[in-house]
């Protein structure tokens, strides 16, 4: 066989194989490679979105944490203020109660002083009558001289 004919036959077979490969084998391979490249690109994009979402979530979590701490501090402050107001109210109530008890005790003491004075006046009047009776050596009628005794009580 002739070398030229062999070479031409091999060229023809090569071109047929190349044409067959380009028509039937090459498109599915290119589609598979394109799909794989697209999946890789989508995966990288999803990873980037995940990173940005994570950063946003961390910022939001930090903001929520700061907000919660601020709210906690505000509640503690409000509780302390309320505690102080309750203490002040209790002190005020106790002072009012002490003043009321003191006023009642003072009124009771004044009433007892008045009763003791009246009793003392009666005793002084009785002693004065007895003293006058002994001085005069005669009996003095207390009912007759009631006005005089009342006048003496008033002077005492």
From Swiss-Prot:
<comment type="function">
    <text>Component of the F(0) channel, it forms part of the peripheral stalk, linking F(1) to F(0).</text>
</comment>
<keyword id="KW-0375">Hydrogen ion transport</keyword>
<comment type="similarity">
    <text>Belongs to the ATPase B chain family.</text>
</comment>
<keyword id="KW-0066">ATP synthesis</keyword>
<feature type="transmembrane region" description="Helical">
    <location>
        <begin position="7"/>
        <end position="27"/>
    </location>
</feature>
<dbReference type="Pfam" id="PF00430">
    <property type="entry name" value="ATP-synt_B"/>
</dbReference>
<keyword id="KW-0472">Membrane</keyword>
<dbReference type="GO" id="GO:0046961">
    <property type="term" value="F:proton-transporting ATPase activity, rotational mechanism"/>
</dbReference>
<comment type="function">
    <text>F(1)F(0) ATP synthase produces ATP from ADP in the presence of a proton or sodium gradient. F-type ATPases consist of two structural domains, F(1) containing the extramembraneous catalytic core and F(0) containing the membrane proton channel, linked together by a central stalk and a peripheral stalk. During catalysis, ATP synthesis in the catalytic domain of F(1) is coupled via a rotary mechanism of the central stalk subunits to proton translocation.</text>
</comment>
<keyword id="KW-1133">Transmembrane helix</keyword>
<dbReference type="InterPro" id="IPR005864">
    <property type="entry name" value="ATP_synth_F0_bsu_bac"/>
</dbReference>
<dbReference type="InterPro" id="IPR002146">
    <property type="entry name" value="ATP_synth_b/b'su_bac/chlpt"/>
</dbReference>
<keyword id="KW-0997">Cell inner membrane</keyword>
<dbReference type="GO" id="GO:0046933">
    <property type="term" value="F:proton-transporting ATP synthase activity, rotational mechanism"/>
</dbReference>
<dbReference type="InterPro" id="IPR028987">
    <property type="entry name" value="ATP_synth_B-like_membr_sf"/>
</dbReference>
<keyword id="KW-0813">Transport</keyword>
<keyword id="KW-1003">Cell membrane</keyword>
<keyword id="KW-0812">Transmembrane</keyword>
<keyword id="KW-0138">CF(0)</keyword>
<dbReference type="InterPro" id="IPR050059">
    <property type="entry name" value="ATP_synthase_B_chain"/>
</dbReference>
<comment type="subunit">
    <text>F-type ATPases have 2 components, F(1) - the catalytic core - and F(0) - the membrane proton channel. F(1) has five subunits: alpha(3), beta(3), gamma(1), delta(1), epsilon(1). F(0) has three main subunits: a(1), b(2) and c(10-14). The alpha and beta chains form an alternating ring which encloses part of the gamma chain. F(1) is attached to F(0) by a central stalk formed by the gamma and epsilon chains, while a peripheral stalk is formed by the delta and b chains.</text>
</comment>
<dbReference type="GO" id="GO:0005886">
    <property type="term" value="C:plasma membrane"/>
</dbReference>
<protein>
    <recommendedName>
        <fullName>ATP synthase subunit b</fullName>
    </recommendedName>
</protein>
<dbReference type="GO" id="GO:0045259">
    <property type="term" value="C:proton-transporting ATP synthase complex"/>
</dbReference>
<keyword id="KW-0406">Ion transport</keyword>
């Amino acid at each position: 066989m002739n070398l030229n004919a062999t070479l031409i036959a091999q060229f023809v077979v090569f071109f047929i194989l190349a044409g067959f490969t380009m028509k039937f084998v090459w498109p599915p391979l290119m589609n598979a490679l394109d799909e794989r490249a697209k999946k890789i690109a989508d995966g990288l994009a999803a990873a980037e979105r995940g990173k940005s979402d994570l950063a946003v979530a961390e910022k939001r979590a930090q903001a929520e944490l700061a907000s919660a701490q601020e709210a906690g501090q505000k509640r503690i402050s409000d509780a302390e203020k309320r505690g102080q107001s309750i203490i002040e109210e209790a002190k005020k109530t106790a002072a009012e109660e002490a003043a009321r008890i003191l006023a009642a005790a003072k009124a009771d003491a004044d009433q007892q002083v008045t009763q003791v004075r009246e009793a003392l006046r009666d005793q002084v009047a009785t002693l004065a009558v007895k003293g006058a009776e002994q001085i005069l050596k005669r009996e003095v009628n207390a009912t007759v001289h009631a006005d005089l005794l009342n006048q003496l009580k008033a002077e005492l």
